[in-house]
Amino acid sequence: MHPLEIIDRYYEAGSLRDLLVKHSQCVAQRALRIAFAHTELAIDTDFVREAALLHDIGIICCDAPSIHCYGTEPYIRHGVMGAQILRREGLPRHARVCERHTGAGITVAEVLRQNLPLAVPQPTTADEPYMPVTVEEKLICYADKFYSKSHPEREKTIEQAVRSLSKFGGDGAARFLDWASLFEGYGGGLS
């Protein structure tokens, strides 16, 4: 499977495709650097490379003109829209990364508390559909927080990523810090 071929099925050459690919390559490089440093975690590096390159494919469906996205969906739904695309492509495992990488994952409680335009599973379901579960999902979600789409060439520090996540509440920032400890031995906390 060649992620760029899949991207090319949905994106024409130009600013949006270039931005998506640059951002996704940065995310993939950081995730792979961490994966290769942590052989004890038995991370599927082939999958990480593919899924990191495809994790934001859904931005084309969203309304975010500042990053050349002229779709109709709210930007918060880019993961859900990307998951739909990748399921149609026969890539359900990659689709889960799309759904679960927004923020530092989003709990159902956060969806309800913030009135986010995301589907909520039935109350009897224990599943958290927008939360990373596997180490690969967590790693890609983590690596993604270091690169914005508006300036993909600028790598954020852990502290800058935490500040960015803290704007949406402390839960996501705390999850991110747990991953920073796991993946990079970071010992700082929320300030």
What are the residue ranges of the model-derived segments?
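Divalent metal-dependent catalytic cores for phosphoryl transfer on phosphate-bearing substrates
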Residues: 12, 40-154, 158
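Long, contiguous secondary-structure blocks with strong helical propensity
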Residues: 4-5, 27-39
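Generic structural signal for well-ordered, non-transmembrane alpha-helical segments
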Residues: 25, 92, 181-184
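A short, charge-rich alpha-helical start-of-domain segment used by transcription regulators
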Residues: 18-23
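Charged phosphate-binding loop/patch that engages nucleotide di/tri-phosphates or the phosphate backbone
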Residues: 165-191
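Short, mixed-charge aromatic SLiMs
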Residues: 51, 55, 105-106, 162-175
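Amphipathic alpha-helical segments within well-ordered protein domains
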Residues: 8, 28, 32, 82-87, ...
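Generic N-terminal amphipathic, Lys/Arg-enriched alpha-helix
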Residues: 1-17
